[in-house]
Amino acid sequence: MDRDVLEKFIDLQDKENDIDTKSKIYHEVTDRGSVTPTFNQGSSGMSPKSVGSSGRNKNIQLQLTPTKADPTSTLDSHPLKGDNSDQDDITGNMKENEDDVSLGSGKVTVKNNGNGVSAATNGKGGNQELGIRRSNTWKRKSLIMPLMSPEHTVKQQQRQSYQQHCKPSESVSNTPLGRKYRSKLDRNDGQKSVRSSISSIGSLLPDGATTEFSASPATKLKLPTTTTDTAKVVPSVSEDDNDMESLLQSLANKELEILERTRRVHDLFRQIKIEDKIIKQNAEELQQLKKKVSRLVGNQVQGQNSNTTLPAESHGESNNAETADNKSSSLWTKSVSLLNQFDQIIQGTVETKLGLGDSGSSATENQSEGKPKGDDNAGSAIWSLVNEFKNGLGLLATEEEDADGSIGTIATGLATNMEDYGTRKAESSTQAKEIEMYHYSH
């Protein structure tokens, strides 16, 4: 692109945005170091105060960081600078002379008028023209060096002059080396104060008493060993002090040991009490568990005994009923058979009697021969029937006796079982008591 085209483009942009980029900026430096720019009309004849139909004022103001009017004063006021004696001459010459500071391709001229200081810049480029970057870093030896206003420099000069009058050896007190040196001086001052206090104490001591000063503030007194009254009252302390210190230290150690032992004993007593409570609780829980176990065992034993006795009783009753039924059935069967026999005998006798009238002489003969035999048979049958009845009655009596004996045996068995249960329960209770006594004894 040509330069003319670029300038035309810039002019168009200035007209659209109501800005004049060709105006010259003059900087005015006030007493405190703040820079206020003032605008003059450029080649285009436009000013920021008169441009615009709506009458808007668009003032361009540049705010710069406050710097010192004279860079040489900042260099001389730096603590690394050895001598500060020429600062008064420099400040005096600032009011009369004019200093030129070259900044690259441009120059900054600082002039002192009656009311204040004015500065003007000439050169190429916007940044070089304003001198923004160079104003912040005027010949600084290091970036650590702070930028200070003139008021601050005046106060610092007064403080430095006061320090030089009071303590000329502490002119570099603000630097790290100066701080170390100052701490050493303070330490020496403390030792001097200790020595002065010791000397005052020595003035109050009696004649012949001397003091020895060591590095520590503690002092040792040496009393005279002459034959004065003070020597009689106060013996030599240098040897006894060591003995007394050792004795006191041993005494303190013994007291600490005794206190620790007593504390341990108290702790052990507390632990013993806690363990006793735990043992009592465990014993109570054990007794309750024993009671529960004994109840469960008793219930199980009673259930087993009831289960064994009931089947035995039912079995015995069934056997007795079967035997009684068998006996009764045999008795009645025998009686029925005897009755049948007796009926047959009677029937035979009746038939023989009826046959006598119908039959002839042969029948009479046979009947005469058979009569004694039939009579003998009937008599024997009757007597056998009577004997069987007697035997049946005797069997019933024996069965009743047997039933009574079985009931007695069942009762005796139950009694023996109850006795066994009682003995077992007594043994379990005695064992529980023995365990409790063992726990309480131990």
Swiss-Prot record:
Belongs to the TDA11 family. Residues 56-76, 110-121, 155-176 have a biased composition (Polar residues). InterPro entries: Tda11. This is Topoisomerase I damage affected protein 11. Residues 42-55 have a biased composition (Low complexity). The keyword Coiled coil applies. Keywords: Coiled coil, Cytoplasm. It is found in: Cytoplasm. The gene is TDA11. GO terms for cellular component: cytoplasm. Transmembrane segments: none annotated. Residues 16-138, 151-194, 298-328, 354-379 are annotated as: Disordered. Residues 270-300 form a coiled coil. Signal peptide: none annotated. Residues 16-31, 183-192 have a biased composition (Basic and acidic residues). Its main location: cytoplasm.
